[in-house]
Design a protein with these regions (language model features):
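Alpha/beta enzyme core
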Residues: 1-215
């Protein structure tokens, strides 16, 4: 008859530890043409489940404001509120790359304020930071990267600029606006961003930008 393997795994057999996701390793994922998975988390249970599920990137987003704290937009959330969420998520994440959103006002006034916020984030467990804006943020991104902290950019529909945009509207629909967003993406890549969020833009433009960039 057919033999049955009754060999059991020894309790002393080491289990394979999933490889830690880093900003550079995500670059290799894109080069291979593989998909990158990402989720937002604001608390320990959500972070733990995302990490155990094999999610590559966990973002502590400023959407904490209007999805968990009851604010009408992302604008009112404070740095201290973001830190509470960041520390909780840090306790649940081991494998995934942990990225933290820089809230409105934490990088808009001057470079020192921005760098001080970044340093506090890293000391609290963030492995990368995300900030919104196009070419006008390129030099700040360059400074942060030069200080050893990976940066994720964010262009298109940028919620922190909701009032200037006239609401949550699709961006980049005209040829001129599409060209401007492509130029923004190229500048952010050149400045050292390891990834860019493309929010609220036509899928054809997103595809074009994705193909033009190496990140």
């Amino acid at each position: 008859g057919k033999s049955i393997n009754t060999t059991r795994k020894s309790a002393n057999t080491p289990t394979k530890v999933p490889k830690k996701v880093t900003a550079p390793s995500l670059q290799h994922v894109k080069e291979r043409g593989d998909k990158i998975t990402g989720l937002t988390a604001f608390d320990y249970p959500s972070a733990l489940l995302a990490d155990q599920a094999g999610i590559d990137l966990v973002l502590v987003g400023d959407s904490l404001a209007n999805t968990a704290l009851g604010y009408e937009s992302t604008l009112p959330v404070t740095i201290d509120e973001m830190f509470v969420a960041l520390k909780a998520v840090r306790r649940g994440v081991r494998r995934a790359l942990l990225v933290a959103d820089m809230p409105f006002g934490s990088y808009h006034s001057d470079e020192k304020t921005a760098l001080d916020t970044v340093i506090r984030y890293v000391k609290s467990g963030a492995e990368a930071v995300k900030l919104e804006g196009g070419k006008e943020r390129a030099e700040l991104i360059r400074r942060i990267v030069n200080n050893g902290v990976p940066v994720m950019g964010h262009i298109g529909l940028t919620p922190q600029s909701v009032h200037a945009l006239g609401g949550y509207r699709v961006q980049g629909q005209s040829e001129r606006d599409a060209d401007s967003l492509l130029a923004d993406a190229l500048r952010l890549e050149e400045a050292g961003a390891f990834a860019i969020v493309l929010e609220g833009i036509p899928w054809t433009l997103a595809e074009t930008i994705t193909c033009r960039l190496s990140i």
